[in-house]
């Protein structure tokens, strides 16, 4: 099978694509891949590092206001379609999959126009502009949230989940806890604000640190590398309780996620896919700075099923943070109920499900 993949701009579009590629390689070692992204996007460094052949096109997103930039964007799109057709003819894929971001617009559109089987994968509960546009032309739309289904043609939608979920399974949680200094018998909560950290969450954590010192559970706090020195400076003034561990970054996040009892985090699509696959209860603090407020809508999908609590950033204080953690961690029944609810939402074999959809299209 020859697979052309496109997606970029943010890790949320790139990492699911890489997880899918790794799964396909396991199931079909003969498979060949080409990834098309942009020269300036994260994908231009992440994808080649993963050993996957990479080509780039020039593309930009539409501005919401009428402007000359949008004329340039249309011109770039048309040029991107031509460049994509050239790469497609040269690589001769059996199937093309787009995982979101502006770049997959011209790539997947070009493939559909050339009569090649096409899929888009939508990670969020509210679809991005590119995937909504492409849904008119592709054969299938793979989604991760029930809330996303209504935005696409019903006959094309398949619920597959996020391939990243498959990568957190079969991790050693005890090893994960040990690696960061958490003790095995005690309950623990992991608090983090995404790969780069989040200042409002840092502020609430620092404010709460003295009260955390009185708790029976342990707290692992990940600041994000850019915030670490500032947080540690503030912590030094207040004192660092023995049950609170602070790290700038965690390189073995799937292992650590497996080991902890509760997670406090943003509500990015990849994070939620991992948490539900593992059956982890969570307190979700959606980022209000994302397009279409999609993190709050992602969070709502999990909260409504009883697998998480939602704490809006505007309501985030030391008191509300501790309150929500205590209500889950200190109540065994609540913790257990939320674990079961999360597990029921999870799709741990998401990468395999997506590969099955691809196989069916190729064999049509």
UniProtKB/Swiss-Prot annotation:
Catalytic reaction(s) noted: di-trans,octa-cis-undecaprenyl diphospho-N-acetyl-alpha-D-muramoyl-L-alanyl-D-glutamyl-meso-2,6-diaminopimeloyl-D-alanyl-D-alanine + UDP-N-acetyl-alpha-D-glucosamine = di-trans,octa-cis-undecaprenyl diphospho-[N-acetyl-alpha-D-glucosaminyl-(1->4)]-N-acetyl-alpha-D-muramoyl-L-alanyl-D-glutamyl-meso-2,6-diaminopimeloyl-D-alanyl-D-alanine + UDP + H(+)
Membrane topology annotation: Peripheral membrane protein
Gene3D superfamilies: Glycogen Phosphorylase B
Biological process per Gene Ontology, one example term: regulation of cell shape
UniProt entry keywords in alphabetical sequence: Cell cycle, Cell division, Cell membrane, Cell shape, Cell wall biogenesis/degradation, Glycosyltransferase, Membrane, Peptidoglycan synthesis, Transferase
Enzyme Commission number(s): 2.4.1.227
Principal EC category: transferase
Molecular function, one GO term: UDP-N-acetyl-D-glucosamine:N-acetylmuramoyl-L-alanyl-D-glutamyl-meso-2,6-diaminopimelyl-D-alanyl-D-alanine-diphosphoundecaprenol 4-beta-N-acetylglucosaminlytransferase activity
Binding site for UDP-N-acetyl-alpha-D-glucosamine: 10-12, 124, 195, 250, 295
Chief site of localization: membrane
Stored Pfam families: Glyco_tran_28_C (PF04101), Glyco_transf_28 (PF03033)
One GO CC term, this protein: plasma membrane
Compartment(s): Cell membrane
Main function: Cell wall formation. Catalyzes the transfer of a GlcNAc subunit on undecaprenyl-pyrophosphoryl-MurNAc-pentapeptide (lipid intermediate I) to form undecaprenyl-pyrophosphoryl-MurNAc-(pentapeptide)GlcNAc (lipid intermediate II).
Family membership noted in the UniProt record: Belongs to the glycosyltransferase 28 family. MurG subfamily.
Protein name: UDP-N-acetylglucosamine--N-acetylmuramyl-(pentapeptide) pyrophosphoryl-undecaprenol N-acetylglucosamine transferase 1
């Amino acid at each position: 099978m020859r697979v052309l993949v496109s997606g970029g701009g943010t890790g949320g579009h790139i990492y699911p694509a890489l997880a899918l590629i790794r799964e396909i390689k396991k199931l079909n070692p003969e498979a060949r891949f080409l990834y098309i992204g942009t020269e300036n996007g994260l994908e231009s460094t992440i994808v080649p590092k993963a050993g996957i052949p990479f080509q780039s096109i020039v593309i930009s997103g539409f501005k919401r206001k009428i402007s000359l930039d949008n004329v340039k964007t249309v011109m770039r799109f048309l040029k991107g379609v031509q460049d994509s057709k050239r790469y497609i003819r040269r690589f001769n894929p059996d199937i093309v999959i787009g995982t979101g971001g502006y770049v997959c617009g011209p790539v997947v559109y070009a493939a559909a126009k050339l009569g090649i089987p096409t899929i888009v994968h939508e990670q969020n509960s509210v679809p991005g502009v590119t995937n909504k546009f492409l849904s008119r032309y592709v054969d299938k739309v793979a989604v991760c949230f029930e809330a996303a289904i209504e935005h696409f043609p019903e006959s094309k939608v398949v619920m597959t989940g996020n391939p990243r979920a498959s990568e957190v399974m079969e991790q050693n949680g005890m090893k994960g806890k040990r690696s960061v200094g958490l003790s095995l018998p005690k309950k623990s909560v992991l608090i983090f604000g995404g790969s780069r950290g989040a200042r409002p969450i840092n502020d609430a954590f620092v404010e709460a640190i003295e009260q955390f010192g009185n708790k029976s559970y342990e707290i692992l706090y990940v600041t994000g590398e850019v915030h670490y020195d500032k947080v540690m400076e503030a912590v030094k003034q207040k004192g660092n309780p023995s049950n609170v561990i602070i790290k700038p970054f965690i390189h073995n996040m799937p292992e650590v996620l497996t080991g902890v009892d509760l997670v406090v985090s943003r509500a990015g699509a990849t994070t939620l896919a991992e948490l539900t696959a593992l059956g982890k209860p969570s307190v979700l603090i959606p980022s209000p700075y994302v397009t279409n407020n999609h993190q709050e809508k992602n969070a709502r999908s999990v909260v409504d099923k009883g697998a998480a609590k939602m704490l809006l950033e505007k309501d985030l204080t030391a008191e509300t943070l501790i309150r929500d953690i205590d209500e889950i961690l200190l109540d065994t029944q609540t913790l257990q109920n939320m674990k079961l609810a999360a597990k029921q939402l999870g799709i741990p074999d998401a990468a395999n499900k997506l590969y099955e959809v691809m196989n069916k299209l190729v064999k049509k």
